[in-house]
Regions:
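C-terminal scaffold of the Radical SAM
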Residues: 1-168
Length: 168
């Protein structure tokens, strides 16, 4: 996670108006299981630093089906995320792709089964709604005014500009 306030201020000064953080979880054991380089404190500090740098349109990602994740730890993650100055949350299910570090029996056996994933998804939708994050796409939730304009333009077939090494 980038916690350099000067870099964030520079982005803001160059008219970047939205920033997204791949937080994934508020549980350090789950983050470690994912091989993430940050812990929950570093993630929270990065979001708070972005807010302090002037960003008020900040998105965070939650991952469902992480090894070790339970219904209770998911609620803790949702509470962690909604305690931060986020206006948007994306919730994605872990998908193990062939040829990746997760493509092994140990990891496949550690992730939630389909029924549990469905329960976690429904739990996420309900918990986020109770915290003011309304669902507007299958995996996206926003507070009032926090919807991703890029996503909406994409789904409505409008033009947009992609910038960066993976832009298309």
């Amino acid at each position: 996670c980038c916690t350099d306030e000067n870099a964030l201020c520079s982005l803001k000064a160059h008219n970047v108006n939205r920033i997204s953080f791949g937080l994934q979880s508020g549980n350090d054991n789950e983050l470690k299981a994912l091989g993430r380089r940050h812990n929950s404190k570093v993630g929270a500090d990065a979001v708070k630093t972005a807010y302090k740098a002037g960003f008020d349109n900040i998105s965070g990602d939650i991952m469902l089906g992480i090894p070790l994740q339970t219904s209770d730890s998911l609620i803790e993650t949702i509470n962690y995320m909604t305690s931060l100055p986020l206006s948007h949350i994306s919730a994605y299910m872990l998908k193990i792709e062939k040829g990746t570090a997760f493509d092994c029996d140990e990891m496949r056996n550690a992730v939630a089964d389909d029924d549990m994933l469905c329960d976690m998804y429904l739990q996420t939708v309900g918990q986020l709604a109770s915290k003011g994050f309304l669902q507007y796409e299958i995996s996206n939730f926003a507070k009032e005014g926090g919807k991703s304009r890029h996503n909406l333009k994409y789904w409505h077939g409008e033009e947009y500009i992609g910038i960066g090494p993976s832009a298309h």
